[in-house]
Amino acid sequence: MKVALLGTGFGQAHAAVYAARGDVDVVVFGRTQAKLEQLRDTFGFVTTTDLDGIYADPSFDLIDICLPTALHAEHALRALAGGKHVLCELPLALNMTDAQRVADASADSDRQVFVDMAGRFSPAYLLLRDAVDDRTYGQLQVLELELRSALLWPGYDLRSDTIVLDMLHGELDTLVRLLGMPETTTTATVTGTQQGSAVQAIFTYPDAIARVSGSALMPVPYGVQGGYRATFTDGVLEHTFTADFTGQAPHAVVHEHTARGHREVTAAGSDSFTAAIDHVLACLQGEDINQLTPASVLDSLKLTLDVHHAVNRRAGTSAATAR
């Protein structure tokens, strides 16, 4: 299978997964020669600055889009029009109109489109999903999802205009898949004095409440940390994970708390990034059914955009007040 990987930023994470497989032929597109050389030296992939040449080449099976967010929908549609399968990094689009266009084009095509909602394949998420579906601990009453990170990528910031879309979309997808769309949403935000920001969002449901929080105000040695706490009528599942300041060396654990006591629960499986790309390639080989369709992410994208707009209205009001 031949893959065109578009983008040298987050595309590096995808490149590492492809390189570990050894059964795909990857060509990386980028505009910065130094970054392309780094990817070529690290993974041995062919690189190019000729984007039109990629789209004109009928030998590519899959276009993997890791370009800036504003370009995602445009390139997904272009790839489909060229008869190629698509893997698109989050978010699918910056508005629901463009997202629906991709979903409609995907439904009308014999090519497959995958939105890289990798968290759906996280072993800890799958364990939680099964607990909710099977009512292992009764009814889910409170769901708390957290993600905290240092700014680990040179030149990249997570201010109020990007943090929800770039950092919390996956957490909000988890929320929607477990509890559905909320009745009400309340947000709060703070912006770092130089870089970063933090967001808290509270959601209400008829019989549950939820909180999603993200912070990009952490010092570099903090790395990335987060997880969930799910409180049921008859128990609690608590998941924590950490990764070092390179974003690597992840460690994750899930604990169960019930009236019988406390124990660590095994959440088996690959890391979510690897599992998601493995799923994409399995689908293209006819071995699995697409769980990452554009239609499947529309509700979570709508909620993400709603929170994004609420946070930025609040941030704008705070800035005006400060002046």
Language-model-derived ranges and their functions:
Residues 31-34, 264-278:
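Active-site loop of classical SDR/Rossmann-like NAD(P)-dependent oxidoreductases
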Residues 1-43:
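N-terminal Rossmann-like dinucleotide-binding module
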Residues 14, 43-103:
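Beta-loop-alpha module in the N-terminal Rossmann-like domain of NAD(P)-dependent dehydrogenases
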Residues 116-123, 151-184, 196-197, 296-297:
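Mid-domain beta-loop-alpha active-site segment that forms a flexible
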Residues 172-245, 276-282, 322-323:
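Contiguous beta-strand/loop segments that form the cofactor/metal-binding neighborhood of enzyme cores
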Residues 5, 62-65, 111-112, 278-323:
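C-terminal helix-rich "cap/oligomerization" subdomain common to oxidoreductases
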Residues 228-230, 245-260:
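Short polybasic amphipathic segments
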Residues 93-152:
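A contiguous active-site-proximal alpha/beta segment in oxidoreductase catalytic domains
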